[in-house]
Amino acid sequence: MFCGEDFRFGAGAEGTPDLLKRMAPCPVAVLPLKEAGGEKVSSSRIKRLLADADMAGANALLCVPYFIQGTVEHGRHVGSGLGFPTVNLALPAEKAFPREGVYGGRAETPAGEFPAIVNIGARPTFGVQEKKIEAYLDGFSGNLYGETVRLFPEEYYRPTTAFPSAEALKEQLARDIARLRERSRK
């Protein structure tokens, strides 16, 4: 088991790493604190950066880039009907997520890696308030149902928006994809 030297647990946060070492049924390694930018690196700090959609800031503190992994499930097939098929993932309850919105990034799939537009949250244009993760994989055509994919939201583009029509949404998606392609060329 690992914990930081400032780790606290229990009622009133009175449990210390030394107490954990005495109580734990396994070895406990107490790790020294790390700093970045003059501030302690902590899960709270990383969660705050994610909530602010500061993916570069969060990734600078993580050992690996932030990603969301899940099994592709069937959605409502609205994206396909608009000409922008997406992969749909359930939101894992135990994961810290970035601010709801639309991100440019990439996807790792069994078929390879693709630039991706990642939507985290509701789909208000179609009255869907259930929060999901869906991604358009630029350059991919095929079926990934039941496959495991990793989505890497890397740059916040915009908040989720209720568009006045499906056509208005399609126009915005085309702009998002153009921005993604420009970003991918760099």
Residue locations for each model-derived region?
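Classical nucleotidyltransferase
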Residues: 2-85, 108, 164-170
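Phosphate/ribose-recognition catalytic cores of enzymes acting on nucleotide-derived substrates
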Residues: 75-186
